[in-house]
Amino acid sequence: MIEFKKLIKAKALYQEPDKIWVAKGMKFFAVDYNGKRVSPIVHVGGWKDRLLGCHRLSSQLLRVGLHHLLPLKNDNILVTAKRKTYVFDREGNVVNAWSEYQGNKPGHQGVCVTPAGTVFFAEYLLNPNRDHDIHLWRSTDNGMTFHVVKTWKAGDIRHLHFVKWDEYEQCLWLGTGDYGENGSENRLYRSADNGESWELIGQYSQDWRAIGVCFTEDALLWGTDAGSCPDTVHFVRMDRKTRRIEILQDFEGPCHGCASFSDGRAFFSTGVEGGENEKDHYSRMKEYVNGRCENVWKLKKDIWPLIMQYGVMRFPLGTDNCHRVVFTTMGLKGHGEWVMIEK
């Protein structure tokens, strides 16, 4: 049975074969797989955000901190903070700051960089009245400029959940949510031309509502994100050839994390957000084995209210090129914000 241990009190944002990029409040740096720092510390933003980000509770409550990190093709680094995205050079200098997008930040898998170096940025905002146009942004110059590559008109969808590169098909996948008539806002799109055009692959029902997808040679896998509605949370497989989906099993709570690894393994995590379809107050880590997900670890929600932080386990970006499981626990008993690593 797989086991995990605490590595460092921080958030894991991006994983590489030889290091893990982590964030503590409004600063980021890289550590090796023993938790030793192997890069300079880079501070982000002004003194107010840095002060609020020093303490985990204030950082989680006010959504202050760093949320995404992407190493770019030219060795610069893109990071997202609340309502602002920065690009840093190798010396830790800010070379660009961008804030034209809507929302505090993208979804957890709402940014990606392709092997050719194109950066995609998917807008995520609450948008309860569906009165905002929603945009997918693209940069072809290493994050120095961003331009809208696709727009969903107000009333069409609520927001974008993820955009992710698929090494198997050499394409991009994008997911939207959350409700709509007959689940019309829940969609899966595919682009084979660097985001110029998007083919609608599937739509309707909560089974198309995902926060991200995992890739295998013959399928896409995801858990549904039906946290605040009564629908049962499902684990779904989509065949690459037929594009048909199959419900493999039920989950105990909404799927908040998923990650594929270079050795062929795939992991999924469920969270605690207070939805009526949750079976209990535990967040679970699951491994995909022989066509099903098996529970390998679980933690109970901590004492702090859900408005401060859901109880979740989240994977860093970049796992597809790595073989060792790394993730961050947040809002869980004894694991308020820890980077965990496979023993």
Task: Show which residues each predicted segment covers.
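Short, solvent-exposed loop/turn segments at conserved positions within beta-propeller repeat blades
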Residues: 79-80, 127-133, 156, 177-185, ...
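Asp-box/WD-like beta-propeller blade repeats and closely related beta-sheet repeat scaffolds
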Residues: 88-114, 121-126, 148-153
